[in-house]
Amino acid sequence: MAIFTLQPIFQQRIWGGQNLKTLFGRDVPPDQPIGESWELVDRPEARTRLVESGQTLHELWASADRAKFFGTAAPDTPQFPILIKLLDAQDKLSLQVHPPAALAPQCNGDPKTEMWYFLETSPSAKIYAGLKPGVTRPQFEHALASHTVADCFHVLKTAPGEAMFLPSGRVHAIGAGNVILEIQQNSDTTFRVYDWDRTGADGQPRALHVSESLACINFDDFAPQFAQPHADRIVTCQYFTVNRHRFDEPRQNGDLTISGRGFYFLFISQGAFTISGKEYARGTSLFITAEPGTLTVESRADRGELITVTWP
């Protein structure tokens, strides 16, 4: 197996901030609202580069050695099918929805199922996810017209270590004060149903997609709750599996076994670690190839935590 660090791709967003620098030492552009860092992505407009080799994720995916890098369970798709981001939401995001696979083509978009893992939250941080029990489509449309649609959403307070699974069709928004690791299908399709009547960087209201949103919203999706992890497993779905590995004692050791079935994306969410003899700080993202072997992991802090992503 081989371990590669990943070169992040920063995205300016009106709701972003500077927390990726403050928390993780990232070299983000100063005095700019950086809302997203694309950690692992294979899209025409953005392709992750592996620092040590200089190769892009797409070059590995398109190579004859795909199974060597991504494992025997890698699907036969034109692009690497998972997109992983860090989000710094210092203002609330739009109320939005992503299209289900059955509706995406007619909406001229790509389907997106995703999950959020909360890394840091302010005392007042919250999210909007799904509908309040009993909200109907006519009620939702009436609230849209009266600019009160946020009242239709189910609201949850957030805390570090919580996770929310968001299947396509679930209306949602991230509230202010959340720093999140997001794992999703490789899609950049978002339909905004409401954007709090604010303007974008150009002083104009950002585009809304009300008709597409209404077509895609699951109006039977009421009051979803945070994910309930089973042992190390946080979430698994048909697109990805996300695990959490906790180290509750200083200098605690552990092993991560690579079977050959799949790659690992590894994110250091708490503490610092020595992995196979090399030290890595909090906020580091690593790509670990699928060649069989065992990684020796040692926590270098009182408490440590790793998040890993691989195939389901």
Predicted regions and their residues:
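Double-stranded beta-helix
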Residues: Y128-D151, I180-F222, D302, I307-P312
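Short, structured patches in soluble enzyme cores that scaffold and shape functional sites
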Residues: V97-P99, L119-S122, L131-P133, L144, ...
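C-terminal amphipathic alpha-helical segment
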Residues: T190-G260
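His/acidic/aromatic-lined binding-pocket segments of jelly-roll/cupin-type domains
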Residues: I84-K85, L93, E114-Y117, V155-L156, ...
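Short acidic-glycine-tyrosine-enriched beta hairpin
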Residues: F153-F165, I275-T294
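Ligand-binding loop in jelly-roll beta-barrel domains
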Residues: Q79, L87-K92, P100-A101, N108-P111, ...
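Transition-metal
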Residues: M1-V135, D195-D220, V242
